[in-house]
Swiss-Prot record:
Effect of disrupting the coding gene: Mice are viable and fertile, but show loss of 5-methylcytidine(38) in tRNA. Mice show delayed endochondral ossification, accompanied by a reduction of the haematopoietic stem and progenitor cell population. Defects are caused by impaired protein synthesis in the bone marrow and codon mistranslation by tRNAs. Mice lacking both Nsun2 and Trdmt1 display a complete loss of cytosine-C5 tRNA methylation, leading to development defects and impaired cellular differentiation causing lethality before P3.
InterPro entries: C5-MTase, C5_MeTfrase, C5_meth_CS, SAM-dependent_MTases_sf
First-tier enzyme category under EC: transferase
Any one GO cellular component localisation term in the record: cytoplasm
Keywords on record: Cytoplasm, Methyltransferase, RNA-binding, S-adenosyl-L-methionine, Transferase, tRNA processing
Keyword Nucleotidyltransferase: no
Name of the protein in its database record: tRNA (cytosine(38)-C(5))-methyltransferase
Organism of derivation: Mus musculus
Protein's GO biological process: tRNA methylation; tRNA stabilization
Domain SAM-dependent MTase C5-type as annotated: residue spans: 4-396
Family indicated by similarity: Belongs to the class I-like SAM-binding methyltransferase superfamily. C5-methyltransferase family.
Keyword Nucleotide-binding: no
Source lineage: Eukaryota, Metazoa, Chordata, Craniata, Vertebrata
Amino acid sequence: MEPLRVLELYSGIGGMHHALRESHIPAHVVAAIDVNTVANEVYKHNFPHTHLLSKTIEGISLEDFDKLSFNMILMSPPCQPFTRIGLQGDMTDPRTTSFLYILDILPRLQKLPKYILLENVKGFEVSSTRGLLIQTIEACGFQYQEFLLSPSSLGIPNSRLRYFLIAKLQSEPFPFQAPGQILMEFPKIVTVEPQKYAVVEESQPRVQRTGPRICAESSSTQSSGKDTILFKLETVEERDRKHQQDSDLSVQMLKDFLEDGDTDEYLLPPKLLLRYALLLDIVKPTSRRSMCFTKGYGSYIEGTGSVLQAAEDAQIENIYKSLPDLPPEEKIAKLSMLKLRYFTPKEIANLQGFPPEFGFPEKTTVKQRYRLLGNSLNVHVVAKLLTVLCEGFGNASESCHKMPLILDSNSKILS
C-alpha cells in the first residue's frame, strides 16, 4: 500500500507531523506551509528533510496545490479570530483569509484529498467559519465528525480543551458518527494493554486509555488542587474540581514530565510573587493537573498557565494564611519558601506530547519557545484522532488491533 501524501498547513513547530509519526500510519509529508519564520526554524530543526514553504497559503495557486498530489490535509488555522477572550472577528478577521482561501480551492482541486484533520480553539464550533467549513466538505462528499477534547482524557495532567474535525471522503458514515453533535470524548478503541506516556520512552504508544474523561478548561484564578481552605482568589467549586482532578489516579503525576537538574533560572522574581500571589495557579510535582499553557506564559501571569511549587514540603496553606499581616519584604520571604517556578519549555513540550528528541535551535529565546508552544497542539491527542480517522489504512489497523470503533454507553455529546 502506498504511503499517504500529506499536506501540512499552518505547520508551526511540527505538532501535526510528530502526531503523524506517533500514529504509525504509513505517510509522507509532501509539503509543510507556514508564514511564521521563527516557527519554521524550529520545524526545520526537527524535520530537516521535509519540503517547507515559508509563505502565505493564499500565495499558492490552485495549480501548485494540484502538483503536490496530496491525499491528506492536516491543518491548524489561526485561532485568534475564534478565542473566547478575543474579539471573535470570525470571517471578518484578516487572519481568517488564508483558511477561507483553502475552502474556496478545496472543491476545485483535480483530486480531492481522502482525509482531513483540523484543530482549533473552543469557540470555533460556534463560528460562521465553521459553518462554511461544514458546508464545503459536505458538498465535496466527506463524512465528518467534530470533537471537543482535552489531553486529560488521555491521562495527561494538562487541560487544553480544543476543537477537532476529522473528515473522510467516503459514502458510509463513521461507525461512531453523531450527525449534528460534537463528541466530548474519543471513540473507544479496545487495546490489549493500555500504556502510560513517559518522557524517557524512545517511541510513544499509539493508544493509551480506554476509559475516556473530559476536563474543562481551568479558570484564570485557580489554586492548588488539594487545599481544604480557600486561601486565594478561588471559589469553592474551583477548589473542589481541582481536588477531584488530583484524586483521579488514572491521570499521571506532573513529576513524570519534569526535567532533572537546575531550574533556578525559572523561579518567579520577587516582584511577581508579591503582586500576583493571589492569582497564581500552583501545582506540585505530585499533582495530576495543570492549566492550559498559552503563548503569554512567562510574560504574563493571570490565565497563562500553572506554576510549580518545587519545595514540596513547604506548607502552602500556612504560608498564604500568614500573608495579610506581613510587610512586603516578609511576604516575599514567605512566598520564596515555596520555590515557585515556571515550567520549562521542555516540560511544556513533554506535557504536549512532543517526543524526547524534539528540540529548539539554540538561537530560539525562552520567550519565543513559550510563545510557539502556546500556539501549538497536543501531539498525543492528534495522533489518536489520526488513528481513528485512518482506521483500516496500513498499520493504523494493526495499531487498533482491528477492533471496532464504538462509543461507551455514557458518551458525552454537545448538541
